[in-house]
A protein has these predicted regions:
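Short, flexible, mixed-charge acidic loops at enzyme active sites
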Residues: 42-49, 132
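Dinucleotide-binding Rossmann-like beta1-alpha1 core, especially the glycine-rich loop
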Residues: 48-128, 137
Length: 238
């Protein structure tokens, strides 16, 4: 049986980064992933790749706190991993009647500790979006928003974790977790892995992992967005 200090369940961006950070210490770490590679089966393989500034999170929530902290951590992390981070900024645009909503987002961002946040008019908007519809009058400009390739980032995190000694178990869906003699015994595919501690980073499957150990149940709410690519003519009508 393979025995470790910590087993991380889930090979998305969260699981890969947790494993990478844990291998900075004198710990024997395993990462268990149900797919054939990291960033293959979950949200990390296909999302917008935005490193959010943190203005859209409710004030006082854990999400708001870690969002702003994470945004500040990414430049140094990407430099270390050799992953491109594009600090393009973000615009939340609106018509005249949307100005109160934009102000609310601004105030929320300031309360969350977001830096370089301002409300701008068409003169600034047109510098970034020259074909924007004439009805657009205002925008919230978040200069700290960036974009990144989520799968390249996940792969880079996992590669550094591997170089630091993390062991990976792919094609290994966790089916059972039992507490025996002070350790967790994890049955995953053809593998039985024991660990002193388990980190649940299974993303959309995290609630099911919790159920396997009888831990607190929590609801998951899923959302799916759509992105549209428009030609120059189409943009003018949005």
């Amino acid at each position: 049986m393979n025995c470790y200090d910590i087993a991380v369940i889930g090979g998305g961006v969260v699981g890969a980064e947790i494993a990478r950070r844990l291998t900075d210490y004198s710990l024997k770490v395993a990462l268990i992933e149900k797919c054939a590679d990291v960033a293959e089966g979950g949200a990390s393989k296909a999302n917008s790749g935005i490193v959010h500034a943190g203005f859209d999170c409710h004030v006082g929530t854990l999400k708001a706190k870690v969002n702003v902290l994470g945004s500040k951590m990414y430049p140094e992390l990407c430099e270390r991993l050799g992953v491109e981070l594009i600090n393009c900024g973000a615009l939340v645009v609106g018509r005249e009647e949307d100005l109160p909503k934009i102000r609310t987002l601004y105030e929320q961002g300031i309360a969350n500790g977001v830096e370089d946040l301002e409300i701008v008019g068409r003169d600034v908007i047109e510098k970034y979006l020259p074909t924007v519809h004439e009805d657009i009058k205002y925008a919230l400009h978040a200069k700290t928003s960036s974009i990144i390739s989520p799968y390249y980032a996940t792969i880079a995190m996992a590669e550094e974790a591997a170089l630091n000694g993390c062991e990976f178990f792919f094609n290994s869906k966790v089916e059972k977790i039992e507490r025996k003699d002070g350790v967790y015994e994890i049955t995953a595919g053809d593998n039985v892995i024991c660990a002193k501690a388990v980190v649940n980073a299974a993303g959309a499957g995290s609630a099911e992992i919790n159920k396997l150990v009888g831990a607190e149940e929590f609801p998951l709410r899923f959302a799916r967005g759509e992105y549209m690519l428009l030609d120059q003519i189409g943009r003018a009508h949005v």
